[in-house]
Amino acid sequence: MSTDELQLTFFVFLQLIIRAMKKTELIINPDGSLFHLHLLPGDIAEKIIIVGDPGRVEMIAEMLDSVRVRKSNREFYTVTGTFRETEISIISSGIGTDNIDIVLNELDALVNIDLATGMTVEEPRSLTIVRIGTTGGLQAELPVGSFIATTKAIGFDGVLHFYEGYEWCLDHMLADSLVAHLEWPDLLAYPYAVDADAGLLEKLSAGATKGITISTPGFYAPQGRRLRLEPFDNELNDNITSFRFKGQKITNYEMESSAIYGLSKLLNHKALTLCVVIANRVTGEFLADYKPAVRKLAAHVLEELSS
């Protein structure tokens, strides 16, 4: 074999390796859908509601005037339809920022990557993403059943640290102030803070308390709960409750918003989280029948997204 033939063979082999790598970067199912969400381009609307519970997707879908897409895989259930002539998708993410990493990246790929070539489209689109969820209140004055609009999301999870060039979208002063207040240990991921989309916050926050939200990487010790295992800091919740930043309080715990806000900023999407307080961690009050409150919040979001 000549030198030219060897070079050509090597080039072809190299291209095959590159293509194989790309296939493991953006995994496509045999039907052309994305690996986890099992969605095709065109299955989603530009306005999207994210919930954790797949059952909550169906609850909100019942309010739609019509439905054109119903698809599910694992914990990811998607319904796309119309409300007041506005197309809206409702998608369940499951629990946690790790799942949000999947959902946000695959939603973005559906509108901003040519799935056949793996190339970014010439004119990227911006999605409107609203998370509707439940939450634990961290201030005594927040009654169960009330709504919270997340002005800033603080991540204890570390997901955003795995992405290059994310620093521009962070509120460093807020994160550094909280780290100092909590005497945050070096062995944990450094907290990061990201703002909500200002336009969505103004449009959708009527009737809600505005506050800073902490997204944790777990439900028990990461939120100060004790069962058989003790959390590393028994005063964590008290110290979070007493924290102030430019007159603002940390109002609640949940497990998704930091990644939603951070990835949305990096991918040029608009994001907001609205939650129903179902437990007040200060007073110990718990709302067992919280579904009517979630339904009320969802109706409000649908009305505002369609106006």
Regions found by a protein language model. Give the residues of each.
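Generic structural signal for well-ordered, non-membrane alpha-helical segments
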Residues: 50, 54-57, 93-100, 104, ...
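Glycine-rich beta-alpha junction loops
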Residues: 136, 153, 214-221, 259, ...
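Active-site rim beta-loop-alpha module in soluble metabolic enzymes
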Residues: 174-245
